[in-house]
Amino acid sequence: MLYLVRHGQASFGAADYDRLSALGARQCQALGHWFASHGIAFEAVLRGTLRRHAQSLAAIAEGHGNVPAALEWPGLNEYDSEALIRTVHEGPLPKPDSPEVYRAHFRLLREALAGWMAGRTAPAGMPSWSDFTAGVAGALDHVRSRHRGDVLIVSSGGPIATAVGQVLGTSPDTTIELNLRIRNSAVTEFAFTPKRHVLVSFNHVPHLDAAERRAWITHA
């Protein structure tokens, strides 16, 4: 089984988003403990190269107790949301410190993603959509061709939604909606053979499935 995990809660709205919050670390520690308690031992681990990916994996490993060293895979890195939004919005963005501004941020992101995926825009410093999807496909191909046991991928919402879209053949609009629904530390499962991946579950948070952890469920 391939387990694709979105990073824990990062520092949305802060000067440096690419850093787990204290809650994000707890989310990932709880996930690692859940994996261990269910007898899941990973044959291999891949992760993106962003700080939040490394910190999330470290917390998962702390909770699990026995996780192999990871292969760093740049194709699992997230898109640059600020560069995307600059293609549809001129000038500085207000700090997302209220529900209204938060919603406005994601409306702009949805619009910007659609333009990028359709090839209408070329956000500064970012790959094309086709190159982005190729990076994700390369990680999936690597898993299929080299492994037979349980594999862990730690990445972000964009690459995970893209992977699901590739497996299911979804439209760009559907891929965007999948992306914006993925929760922090959520697990998406693919069964796989040397020839294909099959979606088993999406956006699952079994490690947070308790009343006392309801407030631990986050999206950014």
Task: Give short role names for the model-derived ranges.
Residues 38-40, 143-148:
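Glycine-rich phosphate-binding loop signature in dinucleotide/nucleotide-binding domains
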Residues 110-146:
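Internal catalytic-core helix/loop-beta-alpha segment
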Residues 2, 147-155:
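Generic beta-sheet signal
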Residues 157-161, 193:
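GST superfamily/GST-like fold recognition
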Residues 8, 157, 203-205:
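Active-site metal-binding loops of divalent metal-dependent hydrolases
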Residues 77-101, 130, 145-150, 165-220:
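Acidic, low-complexity terminal tails and accessory targeting/binding regions
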Residues 3, 8-61, 125-136:
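Loop-to-helix element that buttresses phosphate recognition and phosphoryl-transfer chemistry
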Residues 32-110:
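Phosphate-coordination/substrate-recognition cap region in phosphate-metabolizing enzymes
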